[in-house]
Curated annotation (Swiss-Prot):
The gene is aroQ. The record marks 19 as: Transition state stabilizer. Pathway: Metabolic intermediate biosynthesis; chorismate biosynthesis; chorismate from D-erythrose 4-phosphate and phosphoenolpyruvate: step 3/7. Disulfide bonds: none annotated. Homododecamer. HAMAP family: AroQ. This is 3-dehydroquinate dehydratase.
């Protein structure tokens, strides 16, 4: 039976493709979700992609991941990365292997973006690869889970 992973996207990621394309590129959230589904399938995984502009909804999905025995998480918490102790605590609390991902290189941007509350709850963090960071995150998560690429 295929293992499920959640790909969670936070605030403003629904605007990918139109919001500051010089920073985030022209790819849309639909493009991200298609990339995630295809990448996960290549490892025999199922990617469930969700996006919310609400912190509490993201936390509820993290808790749901635990109750549904989801194998792993990929999270782009958007601006909540730099502000949300609650997301950090939820991730630590569920003890599910997690990869943090960001489309832009947060360290080449404003100083406030240089701190991540999510990073300490994740086994890996990726930034600056555009939406390809999601492919890299799922590939790394698959390796952590012991999932092999399917032919």
């Amino acid at each position: 039976m295929a293992q499920t992973i959640y790909v969670l996207n936070g605030p403003n990621l629904n605007l990918l493709g139109t919001r500051e394309p010089e920073i985030y590129g022209r790819a849309t959230l639909a493009d991200v979700e298609k990339l995630c589904a295809e990448t996960a399938a290549g490892f025999g995984l199922i990617a469930v992609c969700r996006q919310s502009n609400h912190e509490g909804q993201l936390i509820d999905w993290i808790h749901q991941a635990r109750s549904e025995k989801v194998a792993g998480l990929v999270i782009n918490a958007g601006g909540y990365t730099h502000t949300s102790i609650a997301l950090h605590d939820a991730l630590v609390g569920v003890q599910i292997p997690t990869v943090e991902v960001h489309v832009s290189n947060v360290f080449a941007r404003e100083d406030f973006r240089h701190h991540s509350f999510i990073a300490k709850a994740a086994f890996a963090s990726l930034c600056g690869f555009g939406i390809d960071g999601y492919r890299l995150a799922i590939t790394g998560l698959a390796a952590k889970l012991g999932a092999s690429a399917t032919a």
